[in-house]
Amino acid sequence: MSNILDCLREGEEVEVKGPSGEIRYLGHGRFEVDDNERRFDNVTLILGGSGVTPGYQIIARILNTPDDKPRVKVIDANKSENDILLSSELEDFARNHCEQFQIAHVLSHPSDKWKGLKGHLNEDVIKEHAFEPAEGNVALLCGPPTMIQKAALPALRDWGYDDDRNLFGF
């Protein structure tokens, strides 16, 4: 989306639709998903591009709530280092909440200096950096439709995650 917005000229208009689903964090592992309360101990967030922004709200709420216990793993997919939004805030969380929070960035077009994951989001990246599909675990997705539809959803479903039980998009 940011690539499209960069190309707009002053005065041009954009129609925006969203959000399609509602996920709210209520505290202490409790989530409200489309008006139903659910409880999860381990949260995987698979985010891409500007999708990190709503994901960040959930992360911050969990990590900044005293005595909140859910563990969070994030896979953040971008093109390059310059495209990673909220980079310093996420790295601060990783440093200050290392027992509760982990983040893996995967870049499709990194610089030669990049030492992290390279390529596109795929099943191997997901299985290495996400919580396995078990009771009390959830995967939440927000990112470009192609990444979600072609990579994240098939890999998570094949692994054992189920739509509307422990697999949700927002």
Task: Write out the residue ranges for each language-model feature.
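Hydrophobic/small residue at the entry helix of a nucleotide-binding pocket
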Residues: 50-55, 148
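Reductase modules of NAD(P)H-dependent flavoproteins
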Residues: 70-170
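Catalytic cysteine-centered active loop of the rhodanese-like fold, especially the PTP/DSP P-loop
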Residues: 43-47, 141-144
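Histidine-anchored nucleotide/phosphate-binding helix
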Residues: 54-66
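Short, conserved phosphate/pyrophosphate- and ester-handling motifs at nucleotide-, phospho-/glycolipid
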Residues: 11, 51, 144
